[in-house]
Structure formats: C-alpha cells, structure tokens
Regions:
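Sec-dependent bacterial lipoprotein signal peptides
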Residues: 1-22
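A structural "domain/chain start" motif
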Residues: 22-92, 201-226
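Soluble periplasmic/extracytoplasmic beta-strand elements of cell-envelope proteins
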Residues: 52-57, 70, 124-130, 144-150, ...
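Short secondary-structure boundary motifs at beta->alpha junctions and helix caps
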Residues: 77-87, 155-196
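Structured, soluble extracytoplasmic/luminal domains of envelope-associated proteins
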Residues: 84-106
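Sec-exported extracytoplasmic/periplasmic mature domains
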Residues: 99, 103-107, 195-199, 203
Length: 226
C-alpha cells in the first residue's frame, strides 16, 4: 500500500468531524505479537533434558528498534507508520514469546532470563532480529520476519544449534491486524522448527536415543510460508 492509500485507509476507517474548518486526528493503534504455544507438539523426546538454558534478550537491527511498525514497498526503502505502533519494544516482545514457548515445550529442566535468578545455566540461547515488517507489493501484502538464533554451551562457547530464518506469509485480507496475526504465526513456526532442531542437538549432547522418526529439518527456513 503506498503512503497516499495508507493515509486514505486510516482516515477512511475513522469518522472525520469538521468543526470550524478543523479535522479530527486519527488515534494511534497499538499492537503486539501473540500466540498460544502448544505443549509437546514439536518435541521428539517427551522428557525435558537435564540442563538449564539462559535466554538472553534478543538483539534487533537498528532500523527496527523503534515503536513504529515498519512497512516497505521495495527492498531499498523502509517506511514507518505513525498511526500503528508496537505496544512493547519489538526485541522484548519477541524474547518474551520465545521464553513462553520454551517453558511450554518442556525442552529443558529450566529456563532463566538472568544468571542470578535460578540454577546456574548450562547453555545460552541468543537471537538477532534482522527484519520485522509488512511488505506491500502493489496489490499483495506480506508479513515478513527474519531472525537468527544460536544455542551455545556456556562453559566453552561451542555452538550446538544455529539457524537463520527469513520468512514471509501472504496477508489475503488487507487489514493491519491481519498483518500482525500472520507475523505471530511466522514466529510460532520459527519456534516450532527451532525447538525440534534443538531437541535433536540436545539428545546427541546427552546420548539420548530419539524415537524412530525423521530427525532432519525438512521444513523451509526461507521463502514464503502458506
């Protein structure tokens, strides 16, 4: 959606009352990513591994480290929507959802956010948010998220798991709330795949045989998700 159409959409969605030549100003709308993690759905081993993971606050590219929701019409230009904003800082919002997902998945015996809040962690999960935006291509809308995650052993820094996702999902009904809904579903997809991959790596780390199943990661990490 181009800037002119976007403004028409915002103003068209709200009543415009004119008093003495002055028009009303549209209200800001605040959004947050959200989904309910499903317990055990992505697990290959039903038991938690005997270790503690420290979830480090995710980093985010500077262009996306702001309250305004980002939209783009080309790979070379970013635009910021003044009337649509995140209710929580994007990096904190995504880290919080990752934390909830890890707890629900029961992947490990403990997940902490700080070193001083519980048992000493064995591993650290970190992430970099490279993109979080709405892509408008003429008549097509897409939700887009790019994210890299790394699970490393704290004692020696060795990496057990590292994966980069760059995914988009088409938004068929062109409403801002639907973009947020599809961004949420993309993050859930990323976490399901990541937990499955970490399940395999941790099983190997602890010498645990997994049930007979395809332990390879066959789901795409880049491109369009339908």
């Amino acid at each position: 959606m181009n800037p002119v159409k976007r403004l028409l959409y915002v103003f068209g969605a709200l009543p415009i009352i004119v008093f003495a030549g002055c028009g009303s100003v549209p209200l800001k709308q605040y959004y947050t990513l959200n989904y309910l993690p499903s317990s055990q759905r992505e697990r290959l081993n039903s038991n938690a591994y005997p270790c503690v993971v420290r979830l480090r606050d995710f980093n985010i590219e500077e262009a996306y480290d702001r309250p305004q929701i980002v939209y783009r019409q080309s790979p070379f230009q970013l635009q910021y929507d003044y009337y649509r904003a995140w209710a929580v800082k994007p990096a904190r919002m995504i880290t919080d959802l990752v934390y909830k997902h890890l707890l629900t998945a029961n992947l490990v015996s403990g997940v902490v956010r700080r070193f001083d809040e519980g048992p000493r962690p064995d591993f650290e999960l970190s992430g970099m948010i490279e993109a979080l935006d709405e892509y408008d291509s003429r008549e097509l809308w897409f939700a887009h998220i790019a994210l890299r995650m790394t699970l490393s052993r704290i004692s020696d820094g060795s990496v057990l798991f590292e994966k980069r996702f760059d995914l988009r999902k088409r938004v068929y009904e062109h409403k801002p709330e639907n973009v947020i809904r599809e961004l949420s579903s993309l993050l859930e997809y990323i976490m399901i795949q990541s937990v499955r991959d970490m399940d395999v790596r941790l099983a190997k780390e602890y010498g645990i045989a997994l049930p007979q199943a395809d332990t390879s990661s066959s789901s795409p990490a880049t491109g369009e998700i339908r």
